[in-house]
A protein has these predicted regions:
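Fold-level signature of zinc-dependent metallopeptidase catalytic domains
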Residues: 88-89, 93-104
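Short pre-active-site segment immediately N-terminal to the catalytic Zn-binding motif
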Residues: 174-195
């Protein structure tokens, strides 16, 4: 992730809400893709330090402190472009969930920053209720508890369906995610990695499905009409293809053409963000 510069010329970072040098309130302006210093007006609105544009804080900024994005002052929606994509948020009656939700939101905003920079369409379910992009952060339902052992009644599977990306809240818990990373032999099982991968499925539906690109896709990635369920069962029973290192970008990519696309998409976004960071710090290769 690139860094930004405060009005006082101090370096500020994507998730910052206050400049530690001059104490200026900070807010991210999605339409400008800039984190900037703000001044508060007598009416309780926020003005960008470099112009007269007026904004209000996202509700999840001032109410929950899990966001730092701004909303145009005359926008009837109290949520920013990122938070209004949420379909389900965690149960905040559990105090520990607030920090896990913060981690989810941080990764989601990092993904959206890249998608906006690439000029990719981000259409919410407020606009397209059945196919728009949305996010649900869900917990496993615990049926019973015996000492340190938990009985899971309903396990939340991270995935994508018709624009809705569901993420298991446990993925924001480092210890649980790392345990699963080792168990599943997934080197890039990270929170931002999940967002990038699942967004790949959304953009397959948005850009490839039923378009002129479907045949070039099949030529490069394979025929997606192959049974996904059978491919999934075969992958977990027998493991990846023997020669996957020579053909696919990851073991999981060898499972089915849809996963090959999503893994390739995610790794492309990995590289885009890595190169942007390197360029920001003037690192040459």
């Amino acid at each position: 992730m690139k860094t930004f510069t405060c009005q006082c010329n101090h370096t500020i970072h994507f998730t910052n809400t206050k400049c530690i040098a001059c104490n200026a309130i900070l807010g991210f302006i999605p339409e400008d893709l800039q984190l900037t210093a703000l001044t508060i007006t007598n009416e309780g609105l926020y003005k960008v330090a470099t112009n007269d544009n007026l904004y209000k804080q996202c509700k999840n900024y001032w109410h929950h402190d899990v966001c730092n994005w701004m909303v145009p002052h005359d926008d009837p929606n109290d949520l920013c472009q990122s938070c209004r994509l949420n379909v389900t948020i965690p149960n905040l009656e559990k105090p520990e969930n607030l920090n896990l939700w913060y981690r989810m939101e941080t990764s989601k905003r990092a993904l959206l920053f890249t998608l906006f920079k690439l000029n990719l369409p981000v259409i919410s379910r407020l606009v397209e209720p059945k196919t728009g992009l949305g996010f649900s952060f869900l917990e496993d339902q615990i049926e019973d508890e015996y000492g340190n052992e938990l009985t899971v009644k309903n396990y939340v599977v991270t995935g994508h369906s018709a624009g809705l990306i569901t993420l298991n809240l446990n993925e924001a818990l480092d210890s649980t995610r790392i345990e699963m990373r080792e168990k599943m032999n997934e080197r890039y099982r990270t929170l931002i990695g999940h967002f990038r991968h699942e967004s790949g499925h959304y953009y397959w539906d948005r850009l490839i499905k039923n378009s002129s690109l479907i045949e070039p896709f099949r030529k490069l990635f394979g025929d997606e009409r192959l049974s996904y369920t059978q491919s999934l069962e075969q992958y977990y029973q027998n493991g990846p293809a023997d020669n996957w290192q020579n053909v696919w970008i990851s073991a999981y990519a060898s499972m089915h053409p849809w996963e090959d696309w999503a893994e390739t998409w995610a790794h492309y976004l990995h590289m885009v963000d890595t190169l942007e960071t390197a360029n920001n710090y003037e690192i040459s290769i």
